[in-house]
């Protein structure tokens, strides 16, 4: 048999193999290259530092049948199958792996030349764990190595062995399933001292020198840690995974070698970022085929939690395709029906597009020299709906959108209006400010307690509301109380005081509703944008006119919205709805918080501002927020149907979408769904009219009133009834 390298070259002894370790050269999965990650000891080597860490693609090894057979033999040996017991690793000699190969990505490097390993274990948002090897030479850049464990016989067998012994999780933390990277690290730790970097626990320093440790902010421990402890310190692995505040130490950790290293890493990690982008709909078939592989299905059969794992992974793979090219949203039956009627399908060629935000110059051009609008209100709303407002426009634009400023007013009239609003706000504020303590009943005291509690924890990550006092959260008992019973912790920040006072004033202004938990989340962005307590208060009052139904004591407003969303899912996504019925998830509880505070906890701060101004336009529907919810379900319906088998799993999956949502893509999808909904209603109405005029006696298709109401742009206002005696706030 021909050997891969000349016979004259000394052979190496394989000591460990990880098969199905891939290089991902491009974002496309079809370009992935499978290979072997090996530890090989050159003949004549006298120290462990001479052992080679190598990655060789399968295609390269297959040029030598003998070498390929040897690599497979070692992988089988490490799988622990009965057939592997007779294999002798000491006899497994192969040709030395290539030091580097630009065309095939193959490499080998002695342990002495390795500076660190960057370890990223499999997570709920990323199926493959990866290890990137960083050398001591800044010029050498090696590709990340992705462990496709569902295809690796040795990893699958080890997972099964652990499962039988109830040792499913690898680390002492007991928080993560065993994966191929664990095996590689454990074997490597037999030949090298691996030290976790304190400043970034995803890095393991290899045989670190004193200078390396200092630059990485790591204290040398002399190799006292067990391999499982090393792995446990990687993010997501349990104890030690969370960084702590080290001040100057962190600054030092990112200097010198680390900066050079991360700079060189930039080109390599770009590949990783690209792979996670795209839309599930644009390439579902390859993903589904991969998920149907027996090895992948077995993981789901062995571990209930793996269904969530696989669902997240399936979405991340599917998002390799370009985001903007959404597929046709109609199902086959509706597509045929619509085509028969001659409607144009909503497809990838005529998708609505997000536009640039409305700049201050463009906004000013909407008004004449008197400050009166010279374009139609609908034109302004359309522009905001598709692009949003620039930060400089929001303070004025939001007051128009919320109805504080009339659209037909002049600048002078608005100035006069603001003066009146200041008088009214101060009057309302004075009503509770001058009250004697004996005049404050239990309800009032209860409301103040609720307000203080919520204000204290509202958006404290925003600089505007950040702590000014030296004391930290949790020290409430150490703060003095003011005349209203509020701690001086709130009084340490003027903006927290204003937030508190506005909520107390609203409690006085709307006595039937009062203050209900969640309102502080609605007021906070208004105050940050307007930075005027009077204007923020009246903007909040206007906002609450449409949001009051979310906070009714009997929760009928939230129930009605969720029921309408239930009908909408049945109407638009019937296959998903059937699955939600099977999993007892038709209560759509996972949307409760999203509707209550309009995605305030699910989106990044800037995205919250953009979403709210889009929803305030009522451009397509006053309940467009329900189509935003529908768009989330539409995006994730395939993975939910295929891989989430219970209410708990669906709830967990939906909750973990927080801070991962692409708002622009979501709004485009929601708009497409609205158009599809509207056209379908029109089509059904036409069909019903034809049936009424025909003699066949067929029953018309009914559409519920709440669904028809989704086509209305009129804001739904529901007021709280009079508060019964003795009933506290919410």
UniProtKB/Swiss-Prot annotation:
GO cellular component: cytoplasm
Gene3D superfamilies with a match to the protein in the record: putative rabgap domain of human tbc1 domain family member 14 like domains, Ypt/Rab-GAP domain of gyp1p, domain 3
GO MF term list: GTPase activator activity
InterPro entries found in the cross-reference section: Rab-GAP-TBC_dom (IPR000195), Rab-GAP_TBC_sf (IPR035969), SGSM1/2_RBD (IPR021935)
Name of the protein this chain belongs to: GTPase-activating protein GYP7
Originating organism: Yarrowia lipolytica (strain CLIB 122 / E 150)
Keyword Thylakoid appears in the UniProt entry: no
Keywords: GTPase activation
Transmembrane stretches, start-end: none
Gene: GYP7
Function per UniProt: Most effectively accelerate the intrinsic GTPase activity of YPT7. It is also active, but to a lesser extent, on YPT31, YPT32 and YPT1. YPT6 and SEC4.
Domain Rab-GAP TBC: 434-619
Cystine pairings recorded for this chain: none
Keyword rRNA processing appears in the UniProt entry: no
